[in-house]
Amino acid sequence: MAESREDCVFLSKLAEQSERYDEMVQYMKQVAALNTELSVEERNLLSVAYKNVIGSRRASWRIITSLEQKEQAKGNDKHVEIIKGYRAKIEDELAKYCDDVLKVIKENLLPNASTSESKVFYKKMEGDYYRYYAEFTVDEKRQEVADKSLAAYTEATEISNADLAPTHPIRLGLALNFSVFYYEIMNDADKACQLAKQAFDDSIAKLDEVPESSYKDSTLIMQLLRDNLTLWTSDTADEE
């Protein structure tokens, strides 16, 4: 028997608490497939599910890539070949999940998003997953997904700047991730710093207007923006 929407949400929470994120994804995909607007809670559950299944594999990929470089430095060709095969396996899993979430966003989530907040949330998500794609791809494929990430972040930013307060956690989270995109994917530290500084300055100016319900979330992201700015400006100073 197919689970009801309420059951899927409850099962998704159980899967989250037991750290069974692959199952959490499946339950939230069932909710998304109903093609109605997700509640804030449902939206967050879906986001957490994909973030964890992809996050663990991104971490694995970084470790394996680092080990591959170490073996290359030692000139151990046999180990390098084995590691390359293993890295390819992780990349296949990453591609599968990125394709999966991007399809859900395009087919189920964005067509049913009626508020600016939900549109920004999903376009930001789209930018994020194309960015993750760009981390492990090369050449033409990397260029293609980087362009799509840039387009999604840009559209999200336009809606966000028009309709969300500078202190809104989703607007701040978007600025944080978009600036990371410029720094890590485009290798444009100046643009990354400019974007992060603008978001930080705009939110500081309106800090007294932050509703109590989102104060903690907003200030946490503001701190992350400031941390990145500190790191990036010291990095560029070191290079000079």
Swiss-Prot record:
Its localization reads: Cytoplasm; Cell projection, Phagocytic cup
Complex and partners:
Interacts with coactosin. Interacts with ACTO/actophorin.
- What's the protein name? 14-3-3 protein 3
The record's InterPro entries line, in alphabetical order, gives: 14-3-3, 14-3-3_CS, 14-3-3_dom_sf, 14-3-3_domain
One Gene Ontology biological process: protein localization
Q: What does this protein do?
A: Adapter protein which is required for phagocytosis and motility, probably by regulating actin cytoskeleton dynamics. During phagocytosis, plays a role in the initiation and/or formation of the phagocytic cup and is involved in the recruitment of the actin binding protein coactosin to the phagocytic cup.
Deletion phenotype, per the entry, is: RNAi-mediated knockdown reduces the rate of phagocytosis and motility. Coactosin recruitment to the phagocytic cups is impaired.
Q: Spell out the GO cellular component terms annotated for this protein, sorted alphabetically and separated by semicolons.
A: cell projection; cytoplasm; phagocytic cup
Alphabetically sorted, this entry's keywords are: Cell projection, Cytoplasm, Phagocytosis
What the entry lists under Pfam families is as follows: 14-3-3
